[in-house]
Amino acid sequence: MKKYVLLIYILVLVTFVSYATYSPTAAMMVESESAIAEDEIWTSLSYGGDFSPLGWRWGDLEMSMPIRISYVTSSLPSHGSAVPRKYKAMAGISARYYFTLVNLFLSYYSGVVDYPEIKAVTAERRIEGGVGFSLGEYLSISIPLHYSFSPVYPSFGGGIMMRVGGEV
């Protein structure tokens, strides 16, 4: 029991120290992913979050190294075969350029994806870009578009992401 408490304490401390030293942002996202197969579009939702324990800012340009964990729900297309649910763990590099109330961003992620229903684990790469709107000193809403390169389930999609913390 003490090991788990110590581990949680260390994780919280490391997270707090990284937030205090750099003030990175954390993000919570809800996305829609689509795959095209047999001339149909399959849509599913992705829930998750990411945080950037390491990052730099030079004037209006911010570079960060986010870690993202997400869960994608399964969905059923009209012909009856399911898009498998999946769990993702990815790390990446991200650049964000700030204007007065608007920011543009581009990210690249690489990681692993677990498909429990088909008992497969595979690598996935993802390119993401979009626009964000600052709603205050520590809050912004981003609208990302992404394409995921995956041997099992390549997908294109978009969503809404809320960023909190740091100087957004």
Placement of each model-derived feature along the sequence:
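Predominantly the C-terminal beta-signal and adjacent terminal strand-loop region
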Residues: 22, 32-39, 122-168
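Gram-negative (and chloroplast) outer-membrane scaffold detector with strong preference
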Residues: 46-129, 133-147
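Bacterial N-terminal signal peptides
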Residues: 7-16
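Short glycine/proline- and aromatic-enriched beta-strand/turn motifs that initiate or cap beta-hairpins
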Residues: 18-79, 157, 161-168
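Short amphipathic alpha-helical "recognition" segments used for binding
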Residues: 6-7, 35, 100, 132
